[in-house]
UniProtKB/Swiss-Prot annotation:
Its EC number is 1.11.1.6. It comes from Comamonas terrigena. GO terms for molecular function: catalase activity; heme binding; metal ion binding. The keyword Protein biosynthesis does not apply. This is Catalase-1. GO terms for biological process: hydrogen peroxide catabolic process; response to hydrogen peroxide. It is an enzyme of class 1 (oxidoreductase). Decomposes hydrogen peroxide into water and oxygen; serves to protect cells from the toxic effects of hydrogen peroxide. Its cofactor is heme. It catalyses: 2 H2O2 = O2 + 2 H2O.
Amino acid sequence: THCLTTAAGAPVARFSTVAGERGAADAERDIRRLFSYGDAARRLGVNHQHIPVNAPR
């Protein structure tokens, strides 16, 4: 993410909106979320239940 910096060194968000109003930052995050969930599912493969950490106890 690209951030600006104030004179005090505190990061300032690139997108600032009114509280409760969805803006470009939220839309961009939603698009990334759509791709990340599918990528994670495909990374584990069809036999994900056989991976020890994913197996039921």
